[in-house]
Amino acid sequence: MNNDERISKPMSWVTTWGTAEENFIATPEGMPRPLEDTTVRQIVRVTTSGDKMKLRLSNRYGKSDVVIRSMHVAKQVKADQSAIDMSTDTAVKASGSEEILIPAGEVIETDPLDFRVKALDNIAISMYFGAAPSAADQMTGHRGARATTYQVSGNQVATEIFSSPATTTSWYFLADVSLMSPAGSKAVICFGDSITDGFGTDWAVPGKRPDTYTRWGDFFAERLQANEGTKHISVVNKGIGANSILGSWPTDSGRDRFKRDLLGHDGVGYCILLFGVNDLLSLSDTGKYDRLIPEYQKMVALCHENGIKIYGAPILPFGKSQDHTEAAEEVRTRINAWMRSPESHMDGIIDFESALADPEDPKSILPKYAPLDGLHPYDGYETMAEVIDLTMFA
């Protein structure tokens, strides 16, 4: 289906940006000042184009209601600044009201609004808070935004540029942004851990900084938009740092959050699964293989039951990591062999492993890609995106 044919057919909602919800119990030092009577401006990058938008707001981990007294969306002027394009500043409502209530434990949708964006635009979402939790274990958001969030006192949702704001690099109460999209448009869920979440693309690594959009998913989105046949495909990053398939720290385990992260968005057509390395760190025996394979099988089955194609990405080598063991290497090798086999029922393989492995030491990532710890290939994220076959999404 070409673009003209898509536009002529009925349109539907498709998620253009999203993040993996978690609580902040692991990093309470990363919290902003108390939220009540402050404005928080958060920056997200949409991955497709459209002119009608809605947002999902989440209080999934909250034990009390969140009250947003006023909320606006606008285009950001420059990637590392709080300034907005005032000609685009638009109020956001839910159920017809400018004051938005997010009940404890719930996720809500805003009303649709007219707001034109181009793919890869940065938008600023400004929230003026009334009641809001401040305890880390009751806050819903995402620690590793890799983008700057700005906080100032009072109601400044329509202020062009903040003066001396407090800053963090996390998102708060945002779940996703969807656009009314042409027929055939689909979202890709990138499901994983810190490698998908983009560890190493901000202050965690000397010389790096946030607001650069250099996660592998960011480069992938840019490639999709540069190719005429895939401009209708959006990218939704569902990576969480330190997350594992079986373990429930620092937030819900991969197996527990997969269904909601897959099906909780609009228009999902694909899933890229790069997950499991944290389950193997410091492994002393090979028994985890028999525990992990059934979880992968459940993920594949859930995708297929819902008409979603799932592409497996074999677990990356980490032989130069301090947490590498021979048992871990054996399990990694066996999992990857299973994933590549017909028995896995994957719809295809995205071979990040071969692209990053050291030819002289295949159990390790090339040092130039993961110089800090041999585990996170933050200097190889662009290489990862380049090996993805775009015809898998055309």
Give the label of every model feature segment.
Residues 1-191, 196-208:
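N-terminal secretory targeting modules
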Residues 296-304:
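Surface-exposed amphipathic alpha-helices with a cationic face
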Residues 281, 316-394:
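Catalytic His-Asp segment of secreted/periplasmic serine-dependent ester chemistry enzymes
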Residues 17, 36-37, 41, 65, ...:
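Conserved SGNH/GDSL esterase-like catalytic core that processes O-acyl groups on lipids
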Residues 191-193, 313, 350:
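Active-site flanking residues adjacent to catalytic metal/cofactor-binding acidic residues
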